[in-house]
From Swiss-Prot:
PANTHER family: DNA-BINDING PROTEIN HU, INTEGRATION HOST FACTOR SUBUNIT BETA. SMART domains: BHL (SM00411). This protein is one of the two subunits of integration host factor, a specific DNA-binding protein that functions in genetic recombination as well as in transcriptional and translational control. GO terms for molecular function: DNA binding; structural constituent of chromatin. Belongs to the bacterial histone-like protein family. One of its GO terms (cellular component) is cytosol. This is Integration host factor subunit beta. PROSITE patterns: HISTONE_LIKE. Keywords: DNA recombination, DNA-binding, Transcription, Transcription regulation, Translation regulation. Heterodimer of an alpha and a beta chain. Pfam families: Bac_DNA_binding. CDD domains: IHF_B. GO terms for biological process: DNA recombination; regulation of DNA-templated transcription; regulation of translation.
Length: 101
């Protein structure tokens, strides 16, 4: 599912809301999460999961085409850890519907 499909699904489930309002809400939530991560904060959505920022130290990588060593700078990357309820729900859906796997 992509963002536009999520917005469409939410708009269908809430016919009393305009599509543009649903889109604005989704964008506001995602922007809030993004802004918090940019500030180095952790965002926790109980039962769903937690977004955080992890530090990746500088390292020596390899150019896959030439095999040449390449210096990779340190960086901070977003990280998501699933919540217990989400993990259990996904696992249960896989068990009840094996063709998804």
């Amino acid at each position: 599912m992509i963002k536009s499909e999520l917005i469409d699904q939410l708009a269908e489930a809430n016919p009393h809301l305009y599509h543009r309002d649903v889109e604005r809400v989704v964008n506001t939530i995602l922007d809030g999460i993004t802004d918090a991560l940019a500030r180095g904060e952790r965002v926790e959505l109980r039962g769903f999961g937690a977004f955080s920022v992890r530090h990746r130290p500088a390292r020596v990588g390899r150019n896959p085409r030439t095999g040449e060593s390449v210096a990779v700078k340190e960086k901070h990357v977003p990280f998501f850890k699933t919540g217990k309820e989400l993990r259990e729900r996904v696992d249960a859906s896989r068990e009840s519907n094996p063709e998804i796997a």
